[in-house]
Amino acid sequence: MVSFRTMWSLVVVVVVVAASLGSSGVHGRSVEGSSRMERLLSSGSSSSEPLSFLSQDQSVNKRQVFDQACKGIYDRAIFKKLDRVCEDCYNLYRKPYVATTCRQNCYANSVFRQCLDDLLLIDVVDEYISGVQTVGK
């Protein structure tokens, strides 16, 4: 009988806590960041279709670390580090066009900077920007 009362008390506590969290308006960071990312991606595109940039004559490989369009110094470690930001940003938003847009123009774009912000890498932004300048044009 004691274990039944303990279980019932535990269920009541869980329901009360869940109800108080649901009504307090707690939102995850990705909800806010997702809307910012959507606005950022839609503002740079002339088309309303989010994947319209994939129809260009260049095929995009999500797993490709080295971008042949980058005319700067080839450094595999820097490319992996920059690519990791885009990969983590993709994992945060789960939108394929976030990953591909993040890599455009040798990582020198506003989506890459937004990803640095959303991944809370603000304290090392200069290090990443230096890497972008090294591999960039």
UniProtKB/Swiss-Prot annotation:
Origin species: Procambarus clarkii (Red swamp crayfish)
Entry-annotated residues carrying Valine amide: 135
PANTHER family membership: ION TRANSPORT PEPTIDE, ISOFORM C
Residues the record lists as D-phenylalanine modifications: 66
Cystine residue pairs: 70-106, 86-102, 89-115
Entry annotated with the keyword Disulfide bond: yes
Modified residues (Pyrrolidone carboxylic acid): 64
Entry protein name: Crustacean hyperglycemic hormones
Function of the protein: Hormone found in the sinus gland of isopods and decapods which controls the blood sugar level. Has a secretagogue action over the amylase released from the midgut gland. May act as a stress hormone and may be involved in the control of molting and reproduction.
Keywords: Amidation, Carbohydrate metabolism, Cleavage on pair of basic residues, D-amino acid, Disulfide bond, Glucose metabolism, Hormone, Neuropeptide, Pyrrolidone carboxylic acid, Secreted, Signal
InterPro entries: Crust_neurhormone_CS, Crust_neurohorm, Crust_neurohorm_sf, Hyperglycemic, Hyperglycemic1
GO terms (BP aspect): circadian rhythm; glucose metabolic process; neuropeptide signaling pathway
Tissue: Produced by the medulla terminalis X-organ in the eyestalks and transported to the sinus gland where they are stored and released.
Main localization category: secreted
Source species, domain of life: Eukaryota
Subcellular location: Secreted
One CC-aspect GO term: extracellular region
Family the UniProt entry places it in: Belongs to the arthropod CHH/MIH/GIH/VIH hormone family.
